[in-house]
Amino acid sequence: MSMEKLDLAVKNGIVVLGGGRYRIGIGVKDGKVALLAPEEMMPEAKETIDAKGNYVLPGIVDSEAHPGCYVPFDYDMKTESKAAACAGITTWGIQAPTTRLGTKPFKEVVSKSDVVSFNKTFPSGKEVINSVSHVDAYLTYMLETDEQAHEIPQYVEEHGVTSYKLYLQTRGMKGMADDDDTNWPSRRAGLGTGIDDGTVFLVMEQIAYIGYPGIVHIHPENWEIARIFEERLRAAGRTDFGAWTDRSPDFLEAQHIRAYSYLANQTPGHVPLYLQHCTTKLSFEEVLKARAEGLEVYAQTGPPWLWAEPEYGWRINVPLRRRENIDALWRALADGIVDVVGSDHVVGWEPSSYAEMYNPKIWDCRTGFSRVELFLPVLLSEGVNKNRISIERLVQVSCENPAKTSGLWGQKGSLLPGFDADMVIIDVNREVKVGKEHINTRSGWSIMEGHTFNGWPIKTILRGKVTAEWADDSPGMRPVGEPRGSYLPRKLRPKNEVVNAGSPARIAVTDRWEKSDFDRPGFSKETLRYTEIKNT
């Protein structure tokens, strides 16, 4: 019996799944993968794409992005979702507080009274995604108040939101006045109240109660202690970019992982924990300890920390790390200690340009830079092409695992029949020295500029339709067509319905991870230099 004509056939490619690579064709019908088959056995298709012998991956599921952080959500999504499509992204995990979901008027600096229920802001956020986005997107709410924590079951049922972030940098700010300068950076990013451990515990209780795919995200970085290091560095006259790394040394990240892993394990039901931008060897040791104690914990990192050293010149949170941590991070990604890669994309300021943003004195430099365009070039050039990870491992950490941890497995993250027909075709041998013509974000600049990367996306397909491509006459990837992204609600379901990403590696703690490489347990070399500095 002959099969109905396909909408799209992708041929002459090597299809990559987490378990292997296959010379096989992909058939698409009604936006879904209809079949994987030898090309000679595929039905006729209305349209055919020739992959030209390149790898065909599932579309990237980028689990952390912050459009709307510093400018109105709809304004940011119009440009940044195009940049995401050009980077091979088909699904974006947008993380936002209630003040940054498109409600009007937009307030550049928020106050406590602006922090309201997500019931009031969700409709505008959903409408923005459905009307202007070039990628599909789901929401991770950044919670601040006890009231929001108590409303989690309602958010799950009515909004389809099952992931919740706790921005621990704002811990200790709950009692501060709106005009307290210490709280200004967070209020500039839309966080008006700050959190305390009581709110953290309430959120963990609620997520443990609702079950899969409910999950708690945390940003592990102890800014209360970072303040002390900043005072010492300033007193020592340090203004170089490496001072931002020394301000927030490795143990401040690891300490939060230990503390909040313990709290998660004490929560009735043992809430699953998702650790964003893990970057240090000490952090990986804490992840392994938490797993050994029975906690379901997932570790994420991002392209900037897999490639850029402080001397490349910028400041982000958590900071860029030095070479020994970058090498350890690649080992952790390969070993299964780190499960997911997410871009943490944000365009820091508006208007933004390299000239406006740059300042050689780190304390005067503006925080943040766009990151989504780093995603595949870093993983391919620094990872696959240097034999640090396999192409299958790239699919696991950037497609499969983020779909599983976010509750989208079965729809996103694979090219198995029944999944959305989201794909990115990559040329692993395309070598490019990055210039402005390769940057698609509205910032118009990147720390990638002037550096050469070997391996690039050349075509992005969302639900069977091309959304971006590197045409023969184009200097780089460019968006194609009108926005067709959709909001992705999630729902609760039994864990046995999915292949759980919760097989984070239960590997034995070998000599590689059982002790610190550094001179003093818990302190990196850069930290050690500043433990004795006194304020003048």
Predicted segment positions?
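Active-site metal-binding motif and surrounding structural segment of the metallo-beta-lactamase
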Residues: 39-56
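C-terminal cap of metal-dependent C-N hydrolases
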Residues: 353-361, 417-487
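Metal-associated gating/positioning segment near the N- to mid-region
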Residues: 51-129
